[in-house]
């Protein structure tokens, strides 16, 4: 390990979950938030490679958990996108910025709803004040994504129900003026349509 290669050694150590080496690099003065060419910091790399103990060690050492890479990802958004509940439960106590958005303009809840990550949706709605009505760059809320971008199955029905119970509006339309109810019916998702009607749609 040389001072010249310190940033690269540090980032690789985080990716590999080598906490001792990470601590040595920090003791030698490496910038805790240094990043690679993709803009990924050590804590983002540790998160990506599910090096959970290393993620916690970097949080404890004061790493910036909100810094986003060139694709707008950070540990919090990564946990939501990938359905990584273990990572989310490590990150939430560190108080991540819930208003950080993906490159599509959605908060962490949005991709979790789209991809059917029910456990992530439950965790976010139970333990945070995340915006359930955030509209992304294409005009979709988490509720609309849960309907439009998945299969309407049991998991998606549960996500829709949770969103409605936590204040998601059944009236917010997409950019073409279509309501969640119209979009659910267009796709033949009658169970979801009934949930929306019960919520006042």
In which residue ranges do the predicted regions lie?
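Conserved ankyrin/ankyrin-like repeat signature
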Residues: 21, 53-54, 86-87, 119-120, ...
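Ankyrin repeat domain, specifically the short helix-to-loop turn at the C-terminus of the second helix
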Residues: 23-31, 56-64, 89-97, 122-131, ...
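Intrinsically disordered, low-complexity regulatory segments in ankyrin-centric signaling systems
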Residues: 1-28, 37-40, 198
């Amino acid at each position: 390990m040389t001072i010249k290669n310190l940033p690269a050694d540090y980032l690789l150590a985080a990716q590999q979950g080598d906490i001792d080496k990470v601590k040595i690099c920090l003791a030698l003065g490496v910038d805790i938030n240094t990043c690679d060419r993709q803009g990924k910091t050590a804590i983002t790399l540790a998160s990506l490679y599910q090096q959970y103990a290393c993620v916690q060690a970097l949080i404890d050492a004061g790493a910036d958990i909100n810094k986003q890479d060139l694709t707008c990802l950070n540990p919090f958004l990564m946990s939501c996108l990938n359905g990584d509940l273990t990572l989310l439960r490590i990150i939430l106590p560190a108080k991540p910025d819930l208003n950080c958005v993906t490159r599509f303009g959605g908060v962490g809840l949005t991709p979790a709803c789209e991809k059917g990550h029910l456990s992530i949706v439950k965790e976010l709605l139970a333990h945070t004040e995340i915006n359930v009505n955030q509209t992304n760059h294409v005009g979709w809320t988490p509720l609309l994504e849960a309907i439009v971008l998945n299969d309407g199955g049991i998991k998606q029905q549960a996500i829709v129900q949770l969103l409605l119970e936590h204040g998601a509006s059944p009236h917010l339309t997409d950019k073409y003026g279509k309501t969640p109810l119209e979009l659910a019916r267009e796709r033949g998702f009658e169970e979801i349509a009934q949930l929306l009607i019960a919520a006042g749609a």
